[in-house]
């Protein structure tokens, strides 16, 4: 939603605000302006002419309330918003374009911006000669080009959050978008101090090379049973800053970044596909805190969505001492999280988890309640057949009053055909 301050040309007085979605069109803005001034604007909304309140045809400085307080009549240096179907985000009226945080000085000097000048036709429906530029309807090609440009620019500008920046509110957005239920089972973990924790090198960050070499050696040593089988290996990915980058319509926002280590099934490893064979994604912290959990959840979600078939990864957030926080999808729309205290129990859990789908799967540790199962996101939340087509259709519907009815009906039929074709029971009709 964007707030646009508008002024009627030839009328002295204060600017008035109009709240509107930046993805709405110029035609929608005309409707909103007329509705806001129903008693003073009596013509049809389509007969209004709108100008971008920036000099030099939209390339110069924006007009302020001080500039127009006594009325304005000359629009020759302003850009006409003459295409009714043009999205506001494409004509200089996006939230980013109009963002302005006024100071007290701005308010006192009336240096607050005006965004749109409105020309109301005279009673006989005419508009002065200098304001008579024609407004032509959009062609099918123009509508599709405009929509594609909006979507492309939206994707390019979409916020991509680093995993390390994820917080509890963002985790809640992921959970809500994916319709997840969180399961925190009661674990009666036995005391087992047979494996000591890792001694971090003081005053050196986790990602520094010598620190990485140290914790990789520790993990290699205590996952020796798995690695000696010949079908598992540890992969240090801390230096690959984009391996978990993801943009997916099933998520509320894009995410970017990496983790520290992957445990990979060697038989499926592919040098060209980084996540081939991934069984466990590990994030290491010198000190694990509650605020780190959203990062681990984001890494699990990304890894699960990006991993090839037959990969069912878990996530581990750990300090390699007394915090071993595991996350995985245990059933449809169920996100299970377990925190263990002792390294020995954690390594036993890892072994049972990653071997769970093999013929030599050991029984799950006795302290784990119930049966152990892992699935991936695609098993309960498949990728939309054509998310872009769905979004495009939504935008066409919003522009129903400015596109030809025949064009809109054709797009509806195309979209419906795509939906039917995606249904397995009807797919044979289209092969």
UniProtKB/Swiss-Prot annotation:
It is found in: Secreted; Host cell. It comes from the Eukaryota. Induction: Expressed during colonization of tomato leaves by P.infestans. InterPro entries: Crinkler_N. Residues 18-54 are annotated as: LQLFLAK domain. Residues 1-17 form the signal peptide. Residues 55-113 are annotated as: DWL domain. Disulfide bonds: none annotated. The CRN proteins have modular architectures that include a signal peptide, a conserved N-terminus, and highly diverse C-terminal domains. The conserved CRN N-terminus harbors a distinct LXLFLAK motif, which is followed by the conserved DWL domain. A highly conserved HVLVXXP motif marks the end of the CRN N-terminal domains and forms a junction where diverse C-terminal domains are fused. The conserved CRN N-terminus mediates the translocation into the plant host cells. Secreted effector that elicits necrosis in host plants, a characteristic of plant innate immunity. This is Crinkler effector protein 1.
């Amino acid at each position: 939603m964007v707030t646009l301050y508008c002024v009627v040309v030839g009328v002295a007085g204060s600017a008035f605000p109009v709240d509107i979605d930046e993805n709405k069109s110029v035609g929608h803005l005309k409707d909103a302006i007329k509705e806001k001034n129903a008693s003073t604007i009596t013509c049809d909304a389509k007969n209004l002419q709108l100008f971008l309140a920036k000099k030099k045809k939209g390339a110069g400085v924006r007009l302020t309330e001080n500039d127009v307080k006594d009325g304005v009549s000359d629009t020759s240096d302003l850009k006409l918003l003459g295409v009714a179907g043009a999205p506001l985000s494409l004509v200089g009226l996006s939230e980013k374009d109009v963002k302005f945080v006024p100071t007290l000085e701005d308010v006192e000097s009336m240096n607050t911006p005006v965004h749109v000048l409105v020309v109301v036709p005279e009673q006989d429906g005419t508009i002065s000669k200098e304001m008579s530029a024609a407004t032509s309807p959009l062609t099918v090609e123009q509508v599709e080009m405009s929509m594609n440009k909006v979507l492309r620019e939206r994707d390019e500008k979409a916020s991509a959050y680093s995993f390390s920046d994820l917080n509890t509110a963002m985790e809640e957005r992921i959970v809500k978008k994916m319709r997840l239920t969180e399961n925190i089972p009661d674990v009666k973990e036995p005391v087992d101090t047979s494996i000591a924790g890792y001694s971090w090198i003081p005053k050196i960050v986790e990602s520094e090379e010598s620190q990485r070499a140290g914790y990789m050696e520790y993990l290699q040593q205590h996952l020796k049973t798995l690695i000696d089988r010949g079908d598992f290996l540890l992969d240090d990915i801390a230096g690959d800053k984009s391996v978990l980058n993801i943009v997916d319509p099933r998520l509320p926002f894009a995410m970017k970044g990496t983790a520290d280590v992957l445990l990979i099934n060697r038989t499926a490893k592919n040098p060209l596909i980084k996540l081939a064979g991934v069984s466990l994604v590990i994030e290491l912290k010198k000190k694990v805190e509650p605020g780190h959990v959203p990062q681990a959840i984001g890494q699990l979600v990304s890894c699960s969505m990006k991993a090839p078939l037959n990969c069912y990864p878990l996530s581990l957030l750990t300090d390699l001492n007394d915090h071993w926080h595991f996350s995985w999808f245990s059933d449809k729309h169920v996100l299970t999280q377990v925190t263990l205290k002792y390294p020995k129990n954690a390594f036993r859990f890892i072994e049972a988890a990653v071997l769970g789908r093999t013929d030599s799967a050991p029984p799950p540790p006795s302290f784990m309640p119930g049966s152990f199962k892992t699935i991936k996101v695609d098993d309960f939340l498949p990728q939309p057949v054509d998310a872009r087509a769905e979004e495009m259709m939504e935008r066409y519907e919003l522009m129903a009053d400015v596109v030809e009815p025949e064009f809109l009906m054709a797009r509806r039929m195309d979209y419906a055909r795509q939906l039917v074709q995606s249904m397995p029971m009807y797919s044979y009709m289209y092969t």
